[in-house]
Structure formats: C-alpha cells, structure tokens
Curated annotation (Swiss-Prot):
Signal peptide boundaries: none
SUPFAM superfamilies referenced in this protein's UniProt entry, alphabetically: YehU-like
Pfam families per record: UPF0270
Domain of life: Bacteria
Matching Gene3D superfamilies: YehU-like (1.10.10.610)
UniProt xrefs under HAMAP family: UPF0270
InterPro entries, per database record: UPF0270, YehU-like_sf
Source organism of this protein record: Pseudomonas savastanoi pv. phaseolicola (strain 1448A / Race 6) (Pseudomonas syringae pv. phaseolicola (strain 1448A / Race 6))
Name of the molecule in the record: UPF0270 protein PSPPH_1506
Length: 75
C-alpha cells in the first residue's frame, strides 16, 4: 500500500526519513550531513521520484524509488 507523504504528520515524516538515511548500508561511506540527506529524500518524495510503501505483511514502512515499486500499486 502506498502512503502519500503529505498525509503524514510532519514529525512522523521526518523521523521516517531520518530512520531511512541512517540505516546501515544507505550511506555508502557518504559523510553528507544528516540534514542534507533528509532534504534530498524529502525532495525526491515531493517530485514523485520516491514513495512511502507500507508492507501489510511485515507492518513496516519503507521509502522506495518509484520505479522499484510493483506497478499494480499505482492502479
């Protein structure tokens, strides 16, 4: 299930993005400040390049690139 980013409380969205950008394996040695990485993800969400995907089975939210989400979720 896709969750529109603008329907989340601002603090919830920020925490979700911060969790994503600080996960092991997402920085690839990049020493870009946290705030910059958060802004990049927020920009990708507003441009429609990334989406918030809620997996019903695992009950987890994930940030994903739009092209990585199965097409049936956009129908």
């Amino acid at each position: 299930m896709l969750i529109p980013y603008d329907q989340l409380e601002p603090d919830t969205l920020t925490r979700l993005i911060e969790d994503f950008v600080t996960r092991e394996g997402t920085d690839n040695g990049d020493e870009t400040p946290l705030q910059t990485r958060v802004l990049r993800v927020r920009h990708a969400l507003t441009k429609g390049q990334a989406v918030i995907f809620f997996d019903l089975e695992s009950q987890q939210c994930q940030l994903m690139l739009k092209h990585d989400v199965p097409k049936e979720f956009f129908e």
